Amino acid sequence: LGNLREDKTLVHVWFTPIATWIVPAAALVASATIAIPPIVVSMGLAAAVFGTGAQLILATVATALLAAVAYCSLFTLLGVLLRRSLLWGLGYVLIWEGIVAGAGTTAARLSIRVYSTSLLNHLNDLEPPSPSNSAVAALLVLAGITTAAFAINVRTYRRLAVE
């Protein structure tokens, strides 16, 4: 949605007689369609090559799928809220998820990676990372991020001004 705003073509979408939630949903589905296959396949293959069985492969694929959907929902929201959202998204992944979240427990509470890693470790009966979250909490947070980001995306899209 960010590119449609920047190049001023979103006005054409607005005047199409469809429900306002459909455009953000289509953006989320489009980004998930592009992102999920390589993420899930590569994580599944890595689990198969380095893992110890079917449980690890299934848990890895399920966790990668949940995390990818959460990231797609969050980054679709960034596309509506910010200009140059790709740079902000890369900054979030590289700086926040890669460096800051690993440095402290408070910052880790705002990291999708920490919740997905915690869920994966619980599903495989491995030592959970620090800080640890229960499997239920990790599932709820990943689902909550996905749902909240999508809901905010729909609300923001409804309130955008036609330019």
Q: Can you describe what each PLM-predicted range is?
A:
Residues 1-14:
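Transmembrane helix boundary and interhelical loop/hinge segments in multi-pass membrane proteins
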Residues 2-3, 24-92, 101, 128-141:
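Secretory targeting signals
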Residues 20-21:
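Alpha-helix N-cap/start motif
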Residues 81, 86-156:
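Terminal transmembrane helical anchor/hairpin motif
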Residues 158-163:
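Short cytosolic juxtamembrane segments of multi-pass membrane proteins
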